[in-house]
Amino acid sequence: MYAIIETGGKQIKVEAGQEIYVEKLAGEVGDVITFDKVLFVGGDSAKVGVPFVEGATVTAKVEKQGRAKKLTVYKYKPKKNYHKKQGHRQPYTKLTIDAINA
C-alpha cells in the first residue's frame, strides 16, 4: 500500500517503512507526526481525494533535523564593480513512515 501526501508545498509518494526528506517540520527527534493531507491511497483498491481522502492519515517518526549542503549564490554586474556572494543551507527533516491508515 502506498499514499501520496502533501507537505511543504510538495507532493510525495510514500510507503510504510520508507525514509523521506521533507522541508523542516516542527518536532524533536523521536516525535510522531500525522499527515492529514492525503491526496491518494493506492493498493488493493485505489482512493482518490477531492482534494483529500477523507479519514486517511499517514503517521511518521522524526529521525533527524538537519541542514542540507551549502549552496553558493553569486551575483555580479559587469563593468560596475558589483559582486555579491551568498551561501544558503536549506533545513530539512528526515522521517520514517510508520503506517498508512485509509
Swiss-Prot record:
GO terms for biological process: translation. The keyword Calcium does not apply. GO terms for molecular function: rRNA binding; structural constituent of ribosome. It comes from the Bacteria. It holds the Pfam family Ribosomal_L21p. Keywords: Ribonucleoprotein, Ribosomal protein, RNA-binding, rRNA-binding. One of its GO terms (cellular component) is ribosome. The keyword Cell inner membrane does not apply. InterPro entries: bL21-like, bL21-like_sf, Ribosomal_bL21, Ribosomal_bL21_CS. Part of the 50S ribosomal subunit. Contacts protein L20. Belongs to the bacterial ribosomal protein bL21 family. This protein binds to 23S rRNA in the presence of protein L20. PANTHER family: 50S RIBOSOMAL PROTEIN L21, LARGE RIBOSOMAL SUBUNIT PROTEIN BL21M. This is Large ribosomal subunit protein bL21. It comes from Listeria monocytogenes serotype 4b (strain CLIP80459). The lineage of its organism: Bacteria, Bacillati, Bacillota, Bacilli, Bacillales. The gene is rplU.
